[in-house]
Amino acid sequence: MHPAILIHGPTASGKSALAIELARKLGGEVINADSMQVYSDLQVISARPTEEEMAGVPHHLFGYVDAGRRYSTGEWLESARSVLKRLQRQNKHAVIVGGTGLYLLALTQGLSDIPPVPEDIRAEVKAISESEGADGLRLRLAPHDPELAERLGTGDRQRLARAYEVWLATGRQLSEFQNERQPPVLKEGEWVGFALTPPRAALYKKIDRRFEGMLMQGAVAEARALVSRNLDPELPAMKALGMPSIAAFVRGEISAEEAAESAKRESRRYAKRQFTWIGRQFPFWPRIPSPEVSDRMRVIFALYREIDTADTEDYA
């Protein structure tokens, strides 16, 4: 069995292009690990590879979920497990690529078996979050999970809301579930991960250019189609990078210029958070700072050859 190659990195760092070239070189297949690229309605806004870019390389778990659904990490993990089993039977290389670190952690470290939160509790916590903010959530969570409430402070409203809704639904701390992880799909020795860490200044400029290109390529039309469906703004697809700003423009709440600047700013902030995540969650993954695909290929094959000697000829 060939070890799977995992590619992670911040938004706009060139993950998809690299994954496609790796899969093409190895005769392998690409598996998506980006939580927004699973949605069929977000071709442009999620920067999902186009049909032309994917040509000749089989791709999996891209654009197959409706934006009206809450698609969980557990659902993705089971879908990825199915694809990986088939590729292993066929002795094919798997290149798993995406900016959703939680997906990659679940794949390689296991996933906590947290029961689904009922919609009425989700709605209750959402109302608290909107009316009382992170301060209110922290105060409500503190009596039940003081350690997590202290660690999160008021800087992560989404995680505070998640921890509080889990406690309301189960009466247990989120950390209890996290300490009861299922066995990972990919065990030690069955995968190797690489983190793309291009220079930040250049990356931020690329983020700005890419978003400007998205506006030209149909991002507004995608947002308009979703706004017309009156979907819950708290759905994951409606919170994709750039979507809230473009949706506000579609509704006439802000100008096109304001939408563009807001989306660019949030994308840069998100990239910064992804760099932080990589440092904390993947401290031992080899870093590849070069933005050039050829350099990245050489680094990956040099290391990959040490654990898998088949089909890893030099990339020139």
UniProtKB/Swiss-Prot annotation:
What Enzyme Commission number(s) does the record list for this chain? 2.5.1.75
Q: Which GO terms describe its molecular function?
A: ATP binding; tRNA dimethylallyltransferase activity
Gene Ontology biological process terms from the UniProt entry: tRNA modification
Q: Which cysteines are joined by disulfide bonds?
A: none
Keywords in alphabetical order: ATP-binding, Magnesium, Nucleotide-binding, Transferase, tRNA processing
**Its biological purpose:** Catalyzes the transfer of a dimethylallyl group onto the adenine at position 37 in tRNAs that read codons beginning with uridine, leading to the formation of N6-(dimethylallyl)adenosine (i(6)A).
In its UniProt entry, what is this protein called? tRNA dimethylallyltransferase
What is the species of this protein? Hyphomonas neptunium (strain ATCC 15444)
Q: What is the lineage of its organism?
A: Bacteria, Pseudomonadati, Pseudomonadota, Alphaproteobacteria, Hyphomonadales
